Amino acid sequence: MFKATARYIRVQPRKARLAAGLMRNRSVVEAQQQLSFSQMKAGRCLKKVLDSAVANAESNENVKRENLCVVEVRVDAGPMFKRVKSKSRGGRAPVLKRTSHLTVIVGERGQ
């Protein structure tokens, strides 16, 4: 199994989990195709992490890309940046800028 992570990505975890659903239980080639046609920002980030995991597999163990499948995709919430938005009559409202930690694990098919 080969793992790649991206931490502190500026995308909401809830939206990233939607994009992660596109690649669960698929071969690496299918997952890359799904993510390349996705218009979500999280899809682009997950595709980079998936490419990194595949590169780890190819360089460390000489595993072919066609034999790999997505074993696990995890999207965890990272820290939040707290900002303030001005409101009427001198008020203000908190704004939470959410971040995500993305983890993709790929393995050989049949293991």
Curated annotation (Swiss-Prot):
Q: Which InterPro entries match?
A: Ribosomal_uL22, Ribosomal_uL22_bac/chlpt-type, Ribosomal_uL22_bac/org-type, Ribosomal_uL22_sf
Q: What taxonomic classification does the UniProt entry list for its organism?
A: Bacteria, Pseudomonadati, Chlamydiota, Chlamydiia, Chlamydiales
Which family, according to the similarity comment?
Answer: Belongs to the universal ribosomal protein uL22 family.
Where do transmembrane segments lie in this chain?
A: none
Q: State if Kinase is listed as a keyword.
A: no
Pfam families linked: Ribosomal_L22
Its recorded name reads Large ribosomal subunit protein uL22
Q: Which GO terms describe its biological process?
A: translation
Organism of origin is: Chlamydia muridarum (strain MoPn / Nigg)
